[in-house]
From Swiss-Prot:
GO cellular component, one term: cytoplasm
Gene behind the chain: ygfZ
Keyword Cytoplasm: yes
UniProt keyword terms in alphabetical order: Cytoplasm, Folate-binding, tRNA processing
A biological-process GO annotation: tRNA processing
Gene3D superfamilies: 2.40.30.160, 3.30.70.1630, Aminomethyltransferase beta-barrel domains
Natural source organism: Escherichia coli O7:K1 (strain IAI39 / ExPEC)
Major localization class: cytoplasm
Coiled coil region boundaries: none
Binding residues annotated for folate, in chain numbering: W27, W189
HAMAP family: tRNA_modifying_YgfZ
Name of the protein this chain belongs to: tRNA-modifying protein YgfZ
Function: Folate-binding protein involved in regulating the level of ATP-DnaA and in the modification of some tRNAs. It is probably a key factor in regulatory networks that act via tRNA modification, such as initiation of chromosomal replication.
Length: 326
């Protein structure tokens, strides 16, 4: 990517975030084009892509035959096919898996590093972008296209926008917003995704979890009515036989170091600590608070106390902006 990422600043929680423009360099774009694009994706991901309109984007999972996610994809219609955004650390391996059956279909699957991914969030984000684009996405119309730019709308944890665009528009946006917006890198967008309860699948956790272990069913990312796709049997079994015992949780508190993706935490049991869970992502905010996204048993007591392994500080469960009740 020729567009230079902005220098990092300590991320801020959504409630206190000033207007911020972010480079999303830890995320990456990929596309599928060709006559069989829709049919092909329909057989590969958990969402019903045949029902997707131009106005929608959604978080779908791409699974292996056992229903474990290679990655999750923020998917939207793009040209005559689809584009998706995923963590850069998993894109290459995810595309390798996705291409395995492509020889029999009229599709081209490729990474896209020509376009730039930007995020806009914080105080009066909509007003700032309304001065630049003629139409902005909203709850009713979550994807808007204008020229070389696609804008995606997100409701949680507070209204924000993901912009997929060319380098010239990215430079123009930066010039126009530089005076009024703080500039930051991917860590700020990551902090917002953790707060929103959107699962973050990096390379360390690829191939480890079924979609429901990361709350994808609560985010509208799994269709239980569509035809078959890779891993469907296991994903369906988890729902209809109650085989899934895990969920995605948000923890916040303090820690002397940030746990890494794939690491476990410790749960307080009386006077002792027991290892539990798998960390998906963690960020330290500018107020010193540490937020951690972790997959654990779905029956955790709400007042449970956790810590990073052998740490003196503790973490507690925070509410997510959606319900897991089915």
């Amino acid at each position: 990517m020729a567009f230079t990422p902005f220098p990092p600043r300590q991320p801020t929680a959504s409630a206190r975030l000033p207007l911020t423009l972010m480079t999303l360099d830890d995320w990456a774009l990929a596309t599928i084009t060709g006559a069989d694009s829709e049919k092909y994706m329909q057989g590969q991901v958990t969402a019903d892509v045949s029902q997707m309109t131009e106005d929608q984007h959604l978080l779908a999972a791409h699974c292996d035959a056992k229903g474990k996610m290679w990655s999750n994809l923020r998917l939207f219609r793009d040209g005559d096919g689809f584009a998706w955004i995923e963590r850069r650390s998993v894109r290459e391996s995810q595309l390798t898996e996705l291409k395995k059956y492509a020889v029999f279909s009229k599709v081209t699957i490729a990474p896209d590093d020509e376009r730039v991914l930007l995020g806009v969030a914080g105080f009066q984000a909509r007003a700032a972008l309304a001065n630049i684009f003629s139409e902005l996405p909203s709850k009713e119309k979550q994807v808007v296209k204008e020229g070389a730019t696609t804008l995606l709308w997100f409701e949680h944890p507070a209204e924000r926008f993901l912009i997929v665009t060319d380098e010239a528009t990215a430079n123009m946006l930066t010039d126009k917003l530089r005076g009024e917006a703080e500039l930051n890198n991917s860590q700020q967008w990551l902090a917002l995704n953790i707060e929103a309860g959107f699962p973050v699948i990096d390379a360390a956790n690829s191939g480890q979890f079924i979609p429901q272990a990361t709350n994808l069913q609560a985010l509208g990312g799994i269709s239980f009515k569509k035809g078959c796709y890779t891993g469907q049997e296991m994903v369906a079994r988890a729902k209809f036989r109650g085989a899934n015992k895990r969920a995605l949780w948000l923890l916040a508190g303090s820690a002397s170091r940030l746990p890494e993706a794939g690491e476990d935490l410790e749960l307080k049991m009386g006077e002792n600590w027991r290892r539990t869970g798998t960390v998906l992502a963690a960020v330290k905010l500018e107020d010193g608070q540490v937020v951690v996204q972790v997959v654990m048993n779905n029956d955790m007591e709400p007042d449970s106390i956790f810590r990073v392994r052998d740490d003196a500080n503790t973490l507690r469960i925070e509410p997510l902006p959606y319900s897991l009740e089915e």
